[in-house]
Amino acid sequence: VEEKLHRITNKYHDLFADRRHAFPQFVVEHINTVNRNLEISQYFFTDIVKEGIMLYNSGKCELAKPRKLSFREIRDIAQSEFDRLYPYACDFLGVVKEYFMPKEQYNLSAFMLHQTCEKLYYTILMVFTNYLPKTHKIKELSGMVKRFSQELTTVFPQNTDEEKECFDLLCRSYIEARYNKDFSISQEQLEYLIARIDILKDITERLCKEKIAEYDTMTESVIL
């Protein structure tokens, strides 16, 4: 199968080489893998079923329906996603503090701070909901997580023009810090954002660990 897929992929890449279109990307999974992930509502596979277009159906396979997960399964998924996503955020923030800021790479610092926030918000969403939305927008992500704790509403205050400007720069940095030559952010603004994101990091760790502990309690109560 892999050899056949490799030949098909090369053929499509040759066909698209002189075109302005993006190359088609192929993801091949066994039906058992697909159904196992559909059963536990894994977001990548459920989105494909909800939004994908069927091009061919042999009629030999049937897609599974998401089932109600046990508290143990919910807890295990939440722990796995926390262990996967939260360290990324910590590493991104560490790179900003230890490497980009000392070298005065301020635009790269802004971009990596955006990535840190994104991963922290993703961590919260996966632990609390087992779902990731298709957005990189910090404003949207911050709005989505606020329902889980009042603390999250205070991470980026909007009381002064300076606070509003810093948050706006953070939100814009995903694109503009890399591709807009006129994008500019100061050392002071970055230091302010780092301090706020440190707070978000601590809140994220505590909230997620508390939620996972809650799942543990629910699991134990069911067993009893």
Residue ranges and their predicted role:
Residues 2-224:
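Terminal alpha-helical segments
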